[in-house]
Amino acid sequence: MGAVISLPVSMAGSFVASCFGGCCSNLVTKTASSLGSSSLGTRLLYAVWLLLNSLISWVSYSANKSILWPGKTCTGTGECGFFTVHRLNFALGCLHLILALVLTGVKSTNDVRAALQNSWWSLKFILYLCLIVLSFVIPNDFYIFFSKWVSVPSGAIFILVGLILLVDFAHEWAETCISHVESEDEDSSFWQRFLVLGTTSMYTASIIMTVVMYVMFCHQQCNMNQTAVTVNLILTVITLVLSVNPKIQEANPKSGLAQSSMVSVYCTYLTMSAMSSEPDDKMCNPLVRSSGTRKFSIILGSLFTFIAIAYTTTRAAANSAFQGTNTNGAIYLGNDIEYEGLGGQTRNQLRYEAIKQAVEEGSLPESALYDTAWLGTSSPTGAMDNQNDDERTGTKYNYTLFHVIFFLATQWIAILLTINVTQDDVGDFIPVGRTYFYSWVKIVSAWICYALYGWTVVAPAIMPDRFDYENYY
């Protein structure tokens, strides 16, 4: 039973070493050049970079090794791993801050600085290596100060970003399904079944996880677990009732069970993950005592954690919830007479911005951004002729915001890895996040997520003048 439960809570196996070596050798060469031609490829490369940096940090901390100058960078008691983790993530974080500053204000790929975002991978990797060397020159005392006053607040902000993404995605998913159902085309019945099945499945999964938590983690002496599971169950019921309340739906017709089901299943999973992340000093975590799955679950869970952080980081900057775009007003592409006197690139860029605004409002599908039929003329320089480039006339996301969020992610990883782990949990690999601190982070994060979703549901009823649901979401 422990093995079955540990799989969704933890994630990846003994293939980490071989996969890690292969990724390192190709990251800055062929893969970078082939993927870097599209905005998605670029974001994936940065995510892989973050993942590899996290894995190196984890292995260094587990082995308690320093990459450079161990005689100077380790403490008198032989502690090396803590400072190695902070140095590696400090170096990568500084790289992203430098890129954020350099790329400030870039809104078009015609800007020469845009090339730094989507190419020049060798140069960025060399700069990263230089920053690593520099980070090992800085004394250990600096990282103690930095971790307390920069890494911890940055990690908290990153967690909040992830929660906002989840709530936004819940609304986006439900809205997509409902729009297809209301279109009454040949696929509307499929989308209706998909919406009903998805909602039912997520509520069922929430109930199953709640029962499992009460059975496995809520013994008589486990007051923390009992409280966390009970509060989560109460909040699930509250969000369910709110989402179908007649007054709420009158103010927000798009509110429903679909959004609340996704929030409920995610928050219930977070709570269950918190149970499995706590130490077993009070005999409340049977997964730790399952020796047959212990090392596998540690490796699997650590890799899954890093992948989840990389995904959150990559998705955040391209998400409309963080763009601050005003989505009010009609969309009009204009004609060639209105664009007369403008160059081909300028004309195409104006049209692209109009289509991009329509996509953000939901008036057009995202595929419209990849349709080149709206291009009036090709670039005289041929710079926009690359069919794999989805940023031919404008950036798809805020480059500066993208790198700021990556900086926040590096600091959260540093804190996540270096929070104290009890000695009985230490083996060949240190478990990532097996502390009461991380358990409470997950539990409180679930509560905040419920609060964020509850506000998005209640706010239109409280302040109807500030919400226009024809253009909301």
From Swiss-Prot:
Keywords: Membrane, Transmembrane, Transmembrane helix
Pfam families linked: Serinc
Domain of life: Eukaryota
Entry GO terms, CC: endosome; fungal-type vacuole membrane; membrane; membrane raft
Coiled-coil positions: none
TM spans (from-to): 7-29, 39-61, 82-104, 119-138, 145-167, 195-217, 229-246, 296-318, 399-421, 436-458
Location(s), subcellular: Membrane
InterPro entries assigned: TDE1/TMS
Bilayer topology annotation: Multi-pass membrane protein
Segments on the Vacuolar face: 30-38, 105-118, 168-194, 247-295, 422-435
Cytoplasmic side of membrane: 1-6, 62-81, 139-144, 218-228, 319-398, 459-473
PANTHER family from the UniProt entry: SERINE INCORPORATOR, SERINE INCORPORATOR, ISOFORM F
Similarity-based family: Belongs to the TDE1 family.
Protein name: Membrane protein TMS1
Organism of origin: Saccharomyces cerevisiae (strain ATCC 204508 / S288c)
Lineage: Eukaryota, Fungi, Dikarya, Ascomycota, Saccharomycotina
